[in-house]
From Swiss-Prot:
Record gene name: rsad1
Residues that, per the record, bind [4Fe-4S] cluster: 34, 38, 41
Organism: Dictyostelium discoideum (Social amoeba)
Lineage, uppermost ranks: Eukaryota, Amoebozoa, Evosea, Eumycetozoa, Dictyostelia
Keywords from the named record: 4Fe-4S, Chaperone, Heme, Iron, Iron-sulfur, Metal-binding, Mitochondrion, S-adenosyl-L-methionine, Transit peptide
Miscellaneous comment in the UniProt entry for this protein: Might carry two S-adenosyl-L-methionine binding sites with only one binding to the iron-sulfur cluster.
Record protein name field: Radical S-adenosyl methionine domain-containing protein 1, mitochondrial
Length: 446
């Protein structure tokens, strides 16, 4: 859908900038609280307790969404059509958003419908909720989120189906609870995804992972979605500190590069053999209909509004005036991290912010064409479809691949079997995707 709309805009040579109103927008709602802090997680998270002010959090989320749309999107005349653009996906992430009161997200949904009257009916919007397998009274909780919030897709944080590895990962559920949660979710929803982490330590063998993965995909019964991640050691996490631990008891030794590569190859092979096609480095779906619309919008460099402590946003506008020559402009927004400070800022005064001026609450960063291009490569090359030239040219105001890329390096990487440059797109091969982080710096001209 995005590429078709972008193509139409380009063919019209930017005439009638209101074609942008057809570009989808995703809404990300961040709930920062968790019952336990996982040792590998570097997200903005805080320990859940009875001191969490649910009512204030609820009002703050709605107020921020309202403020973003009214004071940022609608502050400039050229963007006054923004309310006509559809919200196509909503993602309740965290943290652990299922710990929030259902009334909180009901209020968020009602605010969204008021601000975006041209959005699809709530039944047609992909609405995802992240849930932990050991959530109390899971079945009834999911029923209520489905009935009152409109959730139609569930993402389960399974992470492993081996009890000792769940303990290592700091998870609070066990294998039986993980299996039961998948069954409960599948009985209630047509769209269910769950996460697994592999390449955990040097001790994990190919055969162990093969058996676990096959077992997991059998639980999915050939229908749905799975996200299969390698364990990463992010700075600031407990696991990162344990990499350099001097004591054998706490030190973690990750698999070497060759072992990690072999585990990745096995993952892709086994998943596809069981009917799950890879469409992004870590994402596998049993059909096109099961692909995650929300994340696809990220990877295709669509617009998204992030509300909640630490949430990020991206906004694309078309400056319909002589000074800017009807050029595309893209902006980055980043929220305050700490929930208390975030709520205080939101509730202490009217937030006066402008999409083109940095604000003390919600700093706005205008992205250059080259920054947009780099972000498009980092996101788009994660996918099997790659980066479409038409989208790239549209988002960067006319840049082509040869203007932005080191074409000599591109040619070398093509010959080595890591990269494919076609007249209409740039994409990585299977071997190339394993080396994404090292390939990107090589092919950038600047």
């Amino acid at each position: 859908m995005i590429n078709k709309i972008v193509k139409n805009v380009i063919e019209n040579q930017f005439k009638g900038y209101n074609k942008l109103k057809d570009l989808p927008i995703s809404l990300f709602v961040y709930w920062p609280y968790c019952s336990k802090i996982c040792p590998y997680c570097n997200f903005n998270k805080y320990r859940d307790s009875d001191k969490v002010d649910h009512e204030r959090m609820s009002k703050s989320l709605s107020r921020e969404l309202e403020s973003f749309v009214k004071n940022i999107y609608l502050n400039s005349n050229e963007n006054s059509f923004i309310r006509e653009r559809p919200i196509t996906s909503i993602y309740f992430g965290g943290g652990t958003p299922s710990l929030a009161k259902i009334s909180t997200f009901v209020e968020t949904i009602e605010t969204m419908k008021k601000l975006f009257p041209s959005s699809l009916s709530i039944e047609d919007i992909e609405i995802t909720l992240e849930v932990n397998p050991d959530q109390k009274d899971l079945k009834n909780l999911l029923k209520d989120f489905k009935k009152y919030v409109g959730v139609n897709r569930v993402s389960l944080g399974v992470q492993s189906l081996v009890d000792k590895d769940l303990h290592f990962l700091g998870r609070t559920h066990n294998r039986i609870q993980a299996e039961e949660s998948i069954k409960i979710a599948r009985d209630l929803f047509d769209h269910v995804t769950f996460d697994l982490i592999y390449s955990r330590t040097i001790d994990q063998t190919l055969e162990q992972w093969r058996n676990e993965l096959r077992y997991a995909l059998n639980l999915a019964d050939g229908n749905g979605h799975v996200s299969l991640y390698t364990l990463t050691f992010e700075q600031g996490t407990s696991f990162y500190r344990r990499l350099s631990s001097k004591g054998n008891k706490f030190k973690i030794i990750p698999p070497d590069d060759q072992k990690s590569s072999d585990l990745y190859d096995l993952t892709v092979c086994e998943a596809e053999a069981m009917g799950f096609q890879q469409y992004e480095i870590s994402s596998f779906a049993s059909s096109h209909n099961q692909k995650g619309k929300h994340n696809l919008n990220y990877w295709r460099s669509g617009d998204f509004i992030g509300i909640g402590p630490g949430a990020s946003s991206r906004l694309t506008t078309l400056n319909n005036n002589n000074n800017n020559n009807n050029q595309i402009s893209r902006y980055s927004f980043k929220n305050i991290l700490h929930p208390k400070e975030w709520m205080e800022k939101l509730n202490s005064k009217e937030i006066l912010c402008n999409a083109f001026i940095e604000d003390e609450f919600n700093p706005t960063i205008p992205l250059t064409n080259f920054e947009v291009a780099e972000e498009m490569l980092l996101n788009g090359l994660r996918t099997i479809e790659g980066v479409q030239l038409s989208t790239f040219t549209f988002q960067t105001n006319g840049l082509t691949f040869d203007q932005f890329l080191n074409m000599k390096q591109v040619e070398i990487l093509q010959e080595q079997g890591f990269l494919i440059l076609e007249p209409t797109c740039l994409k990585l091969t299977g071997n190339g995707r394993k080396l994404l982080d090292t390939i990107i710096p090589k092919i950038l001209k600047y």
